[in-house]
Amino acid sequence: MVIRVYIASSSGSVAVKKRQQAIVGFLEANRISFEEVDITMLEDQRLWMYQKIPDEKRPEKGNPLPPQIFNGEDYCGDYEDFFQSKETNTVFSFLRLPSVKDSES
């Protein structure tokens, strides 16, 4: 499975840009393989992302904002979920990846 981070390269929101950078930077720094999917350039990917986000993670109005994280077809979460996993040191579990300890044994 591959980690996919759905981003918006042309977002006018500074908060969205910072959140995207935080996730991408963390993944790069920890050498976690991932793909960036730009939903502003790929309409079919944007629609796919919207369809795969669980109802409980959708806003009352509008569409879910990037960044959104998937492992293959499995929804991992949004920035808030990612941030929480960083705080609790459970990023590998959040991303549905084997932990570093598991891969060393």
From Swiss-Prot:
Gene Ontology molecular function terms on file: SH3 domain binding
Organism: Danio rerio
A family per Pfam: SH3BGR
Localization (cell): Nucleus
Chain positions of motif SH3-binding: 61-67
Gene3D superfamilies: Glutaredoxin
Entry-linked InterPro entries: Glut_rich_SH3-bd, SH3BGR, Thioredoxin-like_sf
Alphabetized UniProt keyword annotations: Nucleus, SH3-binding
Stated name of the protein: SH3 domain-binding glutamic acid-rich-like protein 2
Family: Belongs to the SH3BGR family.
CC annotations in GO: cytoplasm; nucleus
CDD domains from the UniProt entry: GRX_SH3BGR
Domain of life: Eukaryota
